[in-house]
Amino acid sequence: MAEKMNVESFNLDHTKVKAPFVRLAGTKVGVHGDEIYKYDVRFKQPNKEHMEMPALHSLEHLMAELARNHTDKLVDISPMGCQTGFYVSFINHSDYDDALEIIATTLTDVLVATEVPACNEVQCGWAASHSLEGAKALAEEFLAKRSEWKNVFGE
């Protein structure tokens, strides 16, 4: 990583982090003063493990729908292409500990979900690729290690 790249995560040494963790990956201030806070919510150790797509896809649907029951500050929940985590973005919400609480509460909701929201061909671009049980297992595993979420580099 000799030169700084435009994408923040490309400047992160993925060999140094220790999943699971939640880190503030960046902030942006809009022309009217609104602030976006983007969090790297890392479920799996980069280059060692990944989430299987049906479970990841269902967890994305569940988190996107359920998190909005706990905050009106959520902008988006986006899966990482590497399948190791998600980006979670908030607007005008700088409280890291509260962001962690929203994530935890949302994942707790996932554990008791009875269906994946919008899991049909009308509302989803790949409705055949879902696993409610897989999503629940990912949520349970991540929640079990909540004490590690603030420790990005395993120190």
From Swiss-Prot:
Chain's gene name: luxS
Segments traversing the membrane: none
Pfam families in the record: LuxS
Catalytic activity: S-(5-deoxy-D-ribos-5-yl)-L-homocysteine = (S)-4,5-dihydroxypentane-2,3-dione + L-homocysteine
Family from the record: Belongs to the LuxS family.
A GO molecular function held by the record: iron ion binding
HAMAP family xref list: LuxS (MF_00091)
SUPFAM superfamilies for the chain: LuxS/MPP-like metallohydrolase
Assembly notes: Homodimer.
The protein's name in its UniProt record: S-ribosylhomocysteine lyase
InterPro entries to which the protein is assigned, alphabetical: LuxS_sf, Metalloenz_LuxS/M16, S-ribosylhomocysteinase
GO biological process annotation, one example: L-methionine salvage from S-adenosylmethionine
Enzyme nomenclature, EC number: 4.4.1.21
UniProt-listed PANTHER family: S-RIBOSYLHOMOCYSTEINE LYASE
NCBIfam families from the UniProt entry: PRK02260.1-4
GO cellular component terms, semicolon-separated: cytosol
Cofactors, names only: Fe cation
Amino acids binding Fe cation: H57, H61, C124
Organism: Listeria monocytogenes serovar 1/2a (strain ATCC BAA-679 / EGD-e)
Described purpose of this protein according to its UniProt entry: Involved in the synthesis of autoinducer 2 (AI-2) which is secreted by bacteria and is used to communicate both the cell density and the metabolic potential of the environment. The regulation of gene expression in response to changes in cell density is called quorum sensing. Catalyzes the transformation of S-ribosylhomocysteine (RHC) to homocysteine (HC) and 4,5-dihydroxy-2,3-pentadione (DPD).
Cofactor binding description: Binds 1 Fe cation per subunit.
Keywords: Autoinducer synthesis, Iron, Lyase, Metal-binding, Quorum sensing
